[in-house]
Each structure stands twice: as C-alpha cells, then as structure tokens.
C-alpha cells in the first residue's frame, strides 16, 4: 500500500543559474552540470522524471558528481557546483534562505515527478492488526512531514 508521496525540487544556487542560465524545459538541462543521487545498493543514478500535462520525461543531465548522500548534494548545489534534484523536505531550508533556487518553478508547466513510498508485506495474511496500526501511524506522521 502507498505510504506517502515525496515531492522533489530541481534546484541550483542563484549564482550558478546566473552564470549558466535557468533551464525552462528538460532539453535545456543537457548543457548543465548535474549533481546526481545514486542508489546505494547498485550505484545507478536516480532518474530525473519530469511531468507536464500527464506526460513523463526523463531529463538527460550529464553528471559532474554522483553520490549517495543527499545532504552533500544540497551543500554542493548551494556552493554553485551544479543543478540537483532534492526531496522537498531537504531543499526547503535552502530555498527559504535563498541559498538555492527552484529550477522548474511556478512559471513553467514542468514539475518534478514525486517518489512514491510503499509499505510492503510478503503476504496479505501478514497484514495483522499490529502491522496495520504501524502502517497507519507511519502514514499519519510521514506524509505531512514530507509535504512542503
């Protein structure tokens, strides 16, 4: 069952965007430095999905740095190293104080694809009353915390 949807933000420092331009559509990302997050289990970079009018596009962004530490990516982006994709709850303090600026903001029809988080059990019979209570507790606490 779906536990939560994690909104994402594509962002970079104002200085980086002033020097390199602000992308308006996914194809504009090709000339930018990408700060990519990778899966710790197999090293694959996470895809940068964008949505517009019900269509999904994977942005092609050349990586200048790939790591599995989202806080490091936020710090690198704030220092002007490139454009990154951050969970909104990670990006929010940087956006609020101006260290980062959203790339695909309200003035564009493109939106970063959210990540869906699921609660899984191996068999329906394993979804006992205690497990259901845990699921409901997590759903009530996590979903609002991840909305920004």
Annotate the PLM regions.
Residues 92-93, 97, 106-148:
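C-terminal effector-binding regulatory domain of bacterial HTH transcription factors
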Residues 58-104, 110, 119-121:
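Hydrophobic hinge/microswitch elements
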Residues 34-53:
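Secondary-structure junction motif
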Residues 20, 45, 129:
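Residues that form or flank phosphate/diphosphate-binding pockets in enzymes
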């Amino acid at each position: 069952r779906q536990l939560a949807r994690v909104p994402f933000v594509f962002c970079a420092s104002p200085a980086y965007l002033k020097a390199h331009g602000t992308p308006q559509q996914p194809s504009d990302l090709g000339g930018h430095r990408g700060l990519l997050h990778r899966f710790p289990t197999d090293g694959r970079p996470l895809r940068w999905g964008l949505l517009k009018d019900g269509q999904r596009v994977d942005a092609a962004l050349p990586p200048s740095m790939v790591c599995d530490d989202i806080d490091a990516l936020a710090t690198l982006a704030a220092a002007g190293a490139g454009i990154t994709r951050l969970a909104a709850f990670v990006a929010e303090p940087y956006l609020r104080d101006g260290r980062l600026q959203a790339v695909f903001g309200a003035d564009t029809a493109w939106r970063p694809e959210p990540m869906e988080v699921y609660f899984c059990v191996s068999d329906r019979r394993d979804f006992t009353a205690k497990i259901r209570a845990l699921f409901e507790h997590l759903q009530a606490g996590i979903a609002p915390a991840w909305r920004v």
